Amino acid sequence: MSELVAGPHTRAPLSLPTLMRQVLLAAAPATAFGVWLYGWPALNLLLITLVTVLVAEAACLRAAGRPVRSGLGDSSALVAGWILAMSLPPWAPWWIGVIGGLLAVVLGKGVFGGTGQNLFNPAMVARVALLIAFPVEMTRWVEPAPLGSAVAPGFLESLGITFTGTADWDAVTGATTLDATRTAVTEGQSIETALPEAYQPALALLGYAPGSLAEGSALLLALGGVYLIYRRVIAWEIPAVMLATLAVLATVFHTLDPTRYADAGVHILAGSTLLAAFFIATDPTTSPTTTVGRAVFAAGCAVIVWVVRTYGGYPEATAFAVLLMNAFTPLIDHWIRPRVYGRTRLGAPLSTDREGP
């Protein structure tokens, strides 16, 4: 008679709330730097977005008949709102944060059934929808105005910027590095002549340049990503393959024609490349489950980013790239499957014959 034994199982070392809080902890330094760099309006936008996602998540949980306290306690909505706020223009009006927060929770999560059921990254769903619906507000980049500096708006002035839009935009806005490269290509100019004014590697590494609220500091984002890998919150394959693929593509084409194609440093340090590689594309719900699948997913993201930045109508492409590859995740998981316990990688059952003593 066969002996009944329990099936093999294991328990994850980190719970969902713990994982989400680790992500928030890793994103906090880059976010704090962005708030310092762009002043009170950036903090206003961050808080508005976070409050909106929490209220929207509570409403969705109540409508679905699920416990509100435990649903909010997993911090998944907070992470979605935080990542969304990091990717928004720092002086965007209050309603951008409200609409974006609602889209992230309702359209990005709620319609799919809630946490763990969504096909697309909620923050990027909101960001792309906002970019399509409100292109002016979503592409208005301000020059750095650090807190405490002579050019920084005071607290009361920041309320006017956030809630009434009373800012002299021509005096405070500037072009991002990717905007400058895109404009140069469109006007038939050489990228090599346009970049020195818009791109300085040292400043790009620190994040002292026009851009989204917390996408600029390459150094802090990379440190946060390394921390998440060390804590085993994210898999290393996605950021490693995504950054390597993008660097190889950029290097090859820049070598062929440096006047037409930006180099790897521009593609890696400018825009939201590092934010996407470490904090967005690594979302376990919307990325493949296998090591090979994650590598394919990351390479696809990198190729789309490079193609759209180089030939497309948008200078920044990470949100589009992540959403497109999110759509391919079920197909990747279908064709690239993990080995089933008790079977070979080809699917044949493992032999159960045992040699006698």
From Swiss-Prot:
PANTHER family referenced in this protein's UniProt entry, alphabetically: ELECTRON TRANSPORT COMPLEX PROTEIN RNFD, ION-TRANSLOCATING OXIDOREDUCTASE COMPLEX SUBUNIT D
Subunit structure and binding partners: The complex is composed of six subunits: RnfA, RnfB, RnfC, RnfD, RnfE and RnfG.
One of the GO biological process terms: transmembrane transport
EC number: 7.-.-.-
Class of enzymatic activity (EC top level): translocase
Topology within the bilayer: Multi-pass membrane protein
Cofactor: FMN
Cell location: Cell inner membrane
Superkingdom of source: Bacteria
Protein name in the entry: Ion-translocating oxidoreductase complex subunit D
Sequence positions bearing FMN phosphoryl threonine: T176
Family, as annotated: Belongs to the NqrB/RnfD family.
Keywords attached to this entry: Cell inner membrane, Cell membrane, Electron transport, Flavoprotein, FMN, Membrane, Phosphoprotein, Translocase, Transmembrane, Transmembrane helix, Transport
NCBIfam families documented for this protein: rnfD
UniProt function note: Part of a membrane-bound complex that couples electron transfer with translocation of ions across the membrane.
